[in-house]
Swiss-Prot record:
Belongs to the thiamine-phosphate synthase family. GO terms for cellular component: cytoplasm. The gene is thiE. This is Thiamine-phosphate synthase. Pathway: Cofactor biosynthesis; thiamine diphosphate biosynthesis; thiamine phosphate from 4-amino-2-methyl-5-diphosphomethylpyrimidine and 4-methyl-5-(2-phosphoethyl)-thiazole: step 1/1. Disulfide bonds: none annotated. Mg(2+) binds at residues 78, 97. GO terms for biological process: thiamine biosynthetic process; thiamine diphosphate biosynthetic process. Its EC number is 2.5.1.3. Binds 1 Mg(2+) ion per subunit. 4-amino-2-methyl-5-(diphosphooxymethyl)pyrimidine binds at residues 41-45, 77, 116, 146. It is an enzyme of class 2 (transferase). It holds the Pfam family TMP-TENI. It catalyses: 2-[(2R,5Z)-2-carboxy-4-methylthiazol-5(2H)-ylidene]ethyl phosphate + 4-amino-2-methyl-5-(diphosphooxymethyl)pyrimidine + 2 H(+) = thiamine phosphate + CO2 + diphosphate; 2-(2-carboxy-4-methylthiazol-5-yl)ethyl phosphate + 4-amino-2-methyl-5-(diphosphooxymethyl)pyrimidine + 2 H(+) = thiamine phosphate + CO2 + diphosphate; 4-methyl-5-(2-phosphooxyethyl)-thiazole + 4-amino-2-methyl-5-(diphosphooxymethyl)pyrimidine + H(+) = thiamine phosphate + diphosphate. It comes from Latilactobacillus sakei subsp. sakei (strain 23K) (Lactobacillus sakei subsp. sakei).
Length: 224
């Protein structure tokens, strides 16, 4: 059973320097926090990401300081040691990141824990892990933000998985200002985005539009 307030999952930014460029990363995050994102996951991974652990730690510390200023949860993707060193608010892991030992250790340290799922079997397996707080399901639509993205699930499958899950579901993958309302209507707890914010011409306006579906249906999430 999850121990977190589902509201923190509503407008969930996932980003690293590979999504913004190094110079723009912190200013974009600052704008996004000021405009009302509810959660931030530091995911610095893949081509054009930071080349050393020391640099990654430095950017993560600065991102964490911004998140604390705005009282927004700061989640680390995959890197348990970094999450523990920084006393991050949470850890998110994928199916290929040796998830269960990391989730258990993270929970022992009081961190929020999230796991990426793509199949019904992965969701059912998540029910056996009491240390897990939420799951990320995706990609929902085609996306260019992740090189290793799997086949898109679509809205009907997302709704079915949300009903199957005993935990709050965060949708991710190809979510945009145009389709976020449809995503919210599936009953998910929130939507995680990368380019919808990092590539937005007007970040405050983009976040206002991403927030809208949750504000108009407050309290109706996770319906069956």
């Amino acid at each position: 059973m999850t121990n977190i307030a589902q509201e923190i999952l509503q407008t969930y930014l996932v980003a690293g320097t590979q999504d913004t460029g190094r110079e723009n990363f912190l200013p974009i995050l600052d704008q996004a926090l000021q405009a009302g994102i509810t959660c931030f996951q530091f995911r610095d991974k893949g081509p054009n990401s930071l080349p050393t652990d020391a640099m990654r730690s430095d950017y993560a510390k600065k991102a964490q300081a911004l998140c604390r200023t705005y009282h927004v949860p700061f989640i680390i993707d995959d890197r348990l040691e970094l999450a523990l060193d920084l006393q991050a608010d949470g850890l998110h892991v994928g199916q290929s990141d040796q998830p269960w030992p990391k989730i258990e250790v993270a929970k022992q340290h009081g961190l929020i824990t999230g796991l990426s799922c793509h199949t019904a079997q992965e969701i059912l397996s998540s029910h056996q892990q009491p240390a897990l707080d939420y799951i990320g399901v995706g990609p929902i639509f085609p996306t260019n933000s992740k090189e290793d993205a799997k086949t898109p699930l679509g809205l009907a499958q997302l709704k079915a998985f949300t009903q199957l899950s005993q935990l709050p579901v965060v949708a991710i993958g190809g979510i945009s200002l145009k389709n976020c309302q449809q995503v919210a209507e599936t009953g998910v707890a929130g939507a995680a985005v990368i380019s919808a914010i990092t590539q937005a011409k007007n970040i405050p306006q983009a976040i206002q539009l991403l927030n809208q579906p949750w504000q108009s249906s407050e309290g109706n999430n996770h319906e069956s």
